[in-house]
């Protein structure tokens, strides 16, 4: 255990001088004496000086304070003791329910599983959300991204997925709140508590108001806890909200460390940092990690370097669209932009595949006809096109669905629709079985039976 002293403080970046024969390694955790602060070594500047990032507030620190090297990376509690608890980036409890009482701690920096250890699978994960199950089905052990700008419903969709999957799925879940609103973290905790699944969830928060060090590392803390459950042979769900804030924290840290910015001001190590995180989120022969990540899209620009880098790592992408949200259709998932590797007849079967592609074809054709309708009106279309437009409008409305987590806001009770019912409903609309029903009947309902019942009342 070597000890050094603080020589410079610039915001969240602290330089510490050690004797030259005992300089800490990169990623070593250092403890400031007489303070609760933990520092993580980022650079060795030479002459025994290391540059570190503070995991927490730097208020009250001053030059000359003694700092001890722990000789290891930041470690966090893992295993069953973390379930039902809320922790910070260092694994300290923040739910005022006493110590964690863990039997084991793991370092947050770990190697990704080797190629030989990894396992792939094609088993589908049913979400109960029609548009997702139909157009961009999730794979068990896969990685999913929820892309969307500000206020189009990423967190609400994430909450609904957690409710539907975590409650229907009996395994363990880990939720990492990265740079998001504390209120949402609080809502989420109570949602889990009220649903009686809190004893199966570990919660790790590094919220918006925290220093960049916390936001940069909290995703790794959550991932480490998920890896432990996976290595014990469990199927784990890992929820990250929001992966963009992880990138943003990296940008802040990179600037403070004096690196040259690259495109749009992002850190030059953007792709590497994203890879380090994403490559660890994988399924092995022991167990699986299914991850669902919310991805904020700055200014609704999907070509921004941050979302563009994230795209490369995902098996399924759920793109939320402001245009669809403005029509009042929620969830505002864009069925033409959203993709999934599972959308393959060999994986999901011909029936599902043809229905999904049929829905996409009808919606794409409707999109093309919109210009003609806007200029010349519906009457100028051929009979076949008129029929297609009517079906497209029904499909568009049938893609909406009332959510369980939004019940308190909408007053409508939530609906869980099985994959079988979803396929049957859309197939019926495509085949013209419901051409006689008004399009309003399809808006904000669960299965197709509900639409038929609703039509009787209109």
Swiss-Prot record:
It is found in: Cell inner membrane. Keywords: ATP synthesis, ATP-binding, Cell inner membrane, Cell membrane, CF(1), Hydrogen ion transport, Ion transport, Membrane, Nucleotide-binding, Translocase, Transport. It catalyses: ATP + H2O + 4 H(+)(in) = ADP + phosphate + 5 H(+)(out). Its EC number is 7.1.2.2. The keyword Signal does not apply. GO terms for molecular function: ATP binding; ATP hydrolysis activity; proton-transporting ATP synthase activity, rotational mechanism. ATP binds at residues 148-155. InterPro entries: AAA+_ATPase, ATP-synt_VA_C, ATP_synth_F1_bsu, ATPase_a/bsu_AS, ATPase_alpha/beta_chains, ATPase_F1/V1/A1_a/bsu_N, ATPase_F1/V1/A1_a/bsu_N_sf, ATPase_F1/V1/A1_a/bsu_nucl-bd. It is an enzyme of class 7 (translocase). One of its GO terms (cellular component) is plasma membrane. It comes from the Bacteria. It is a peripheral membrane protein. PANTHER family: ATP SYNTHASE (PTHR15184), ATP SYNTHASE SUBUNIT BETA, MITOCHONDRIAL (PTHR15184:SF71). Produces ATP from ADP in the presence of a proton gradient across the membrane. The catalytic sites are hosted primarily by the beta subunits. Belongs to the ATPase alpha/beta chains family. F-type ATPases have 2 components, CF(1) - the catalytic core - and CF(0) - the membrane proton channel. CF(1) has five subunits: alpha(3), beta(3), gamma(1), delta(1), epsilon(1). CF(0) has three main subunits: a(1), b(2) and c(9-12). The alpha and beta chains form an alternating ring which encloses part of the gamma chain. CF(1) is attached to CF(0) by a central stalk formed by the gamma and epsilon chains, while a peripheral stalk is formed by the delta and b chains. This is ATP synthase subunit beta. It comes from Pseudomonas fluorescens (strain Pf0-1). The gene is atpD.
């Amino acid at each position: 255990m070597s000890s050094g002293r603080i020589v410079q403080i610039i915001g969240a970046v602290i330089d510490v001088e050690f004797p030259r024969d005992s300089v800490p390694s990169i990623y070593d955790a250092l403890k400031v004496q007489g303070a609760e602060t933990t520092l993580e070594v980022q650079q060795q500047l030479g002459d025994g000086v290391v540059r570190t990032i503070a995991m927490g507030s730097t208020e009250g620190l001053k030059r000359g304070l003694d700092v001890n090297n722990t000789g290891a990376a930041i470690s966090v509690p893992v295993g069953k003791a973390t379930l039902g608890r809320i922790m910070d980036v260092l694994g300290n409890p923040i739910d005022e329910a006493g110590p964690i009482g863990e039997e084991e701690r793991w370092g947050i920096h770990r190697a990704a599983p080797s190629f030989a250890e990894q396992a792939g699978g094609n088993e589908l994960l049913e979400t109960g959300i029609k548009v997702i199950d139909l157009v961009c089905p999730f794979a068990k052990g896969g990685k999913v991204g929820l892309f969307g700008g500000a206020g189009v419903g990423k967190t609400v969709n994430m909450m609904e997925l957690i409710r539907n999957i975590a409650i229907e799925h009996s395994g363990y879940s880990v939720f990492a709140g990265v740079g998001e609103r504390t209120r949402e973290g609080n809502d989420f905790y109570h949602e889990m508590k009220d649903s009686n699944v809190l004893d199966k969830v570990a919660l790790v928060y590094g919220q918006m108001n925290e220093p960049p060090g916390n936001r940069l590392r909290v995703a790794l803390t959550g991932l480490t806890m998920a890896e432990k459950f996976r290595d014990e042979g469990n199927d784990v769900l890992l929820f990250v909200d929001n992966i963009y804030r992880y990138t943003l924290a990296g940008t802040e840290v990179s600037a403070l460390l004096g690196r040259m910015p690259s495109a749009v001001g992002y850190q030059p190590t953007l792709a590497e940092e994203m890879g380090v995180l994403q490559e660890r989120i994988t399924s092995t022969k022991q167990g699986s990690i299914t991850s669902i990540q919310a991805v904020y899209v700055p200014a609704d620009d999907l070509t921004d370097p941050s979302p563009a880098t994230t795209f490369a790592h995902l098996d399924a992408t759920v793109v939320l669209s402001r245009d669809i949200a403005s029509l009042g259709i929620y969830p505002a998932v864009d069925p033409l932009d959203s993709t999934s590797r599972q959308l393959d007849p060999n994986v999901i079967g011909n029936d599902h595949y043809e229905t999904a592609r049929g829905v996409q074809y009808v919606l794409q054709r409707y999109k093309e006809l919109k210009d003609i309708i806007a200029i010349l009106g519906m009457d100028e279309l051929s009979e076949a096109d008129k029929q297609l437009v009517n079906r497209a409008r029904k499909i568009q409305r049938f893609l909406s669905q009332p959510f369980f987590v939004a019940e308190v806001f909408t007053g409508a009770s939530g609906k869980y629709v099985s994959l079988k019912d979803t396929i049957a409903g859309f197939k019926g609309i495509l085949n013209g079985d419901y051409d006689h029903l008004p399009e309003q009947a399809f808006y904000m309902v669960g299965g197709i039976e509900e639409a038929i019942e609703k039509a009787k009342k209109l």
